[in-house]
């Protein structure tokens, strides 16, 4: 069997549709999806198998990255550094741009990225044929910069095989790097954490999802059930009250929504216990971000 394998960094501005694209390619719910921008915070590896036209069985390891943005908050700096690291580690990049975005995001990407890349134009199902053609024409002035330009729709599964074919074309022949049926090397507890975060985006408005995070305190895997004990961190007591809701109605909705998604992904029953705490300025403190896994502790000599 002829095989290829390689790491591909998936880059884009917040809300370009990166996580939706990956979940569609995987036919599974692993990456956090929200209609709100900048939901993804940590890099995730998603493994997509694909047989190309030349007969190669390719293992494409996507590095799902936080959206490219510049903010002074320490958490946002950590997110940007993860995206930059992914670009450095990958042999190929895919820059995903919404058909409705201007070219500034891509121009910023060109200043940051030294790797060969494919430009993918997303959400074409939400634009007219004329609008799509116009945007493709606008990007043509950068044709010397990208390897290929692929218009696509993750929601409608349009041109996804075209994208995978383009990626496989530029990967080197190699033995597979992961087991055949593995979709991600993420631990289940980390996937569950992201599912809880997604539920926060689903049920809470305004700034609360952006000023909150989730810590898994205890995770017990049993044959027929996973037991998850977690707490939701917010910055203000007023936010804590909103997350809990009157008579606990909001936290129940968040918990039920998250638990059902966990059971779908884990393919077994899940017991979920959620608590809420207020911790002022957690997103600006290095110790808090270390505990949450956004900053790795420096090794002492």
Swiss-Prot record:
Entry keywords, A to Z: Cell inner membrane, Cell membrane, Cytoplasm, GTP-binding, Membrane, Nucleotide-binding, Ribosome biogenesis, RNA-binding, rRNA-binding
Domain Era-type G per the UniProt entry, residue ranges: 4-173
Chain spans, region G2: 38-42
Span list, region G3: 64-67
Topological type in the membrane: Peripheral membrane protein
SUPFAM superfamilies: P-loop containing nucleoside triphosphate hydrolases, Prokaryotic type KH domain (KH-domain type II)
GO biological process, one term: ribosomal small subunit assembly
Subunit structure and binding partners: Monomer.
Protein name, UniProt field: GTPase Era
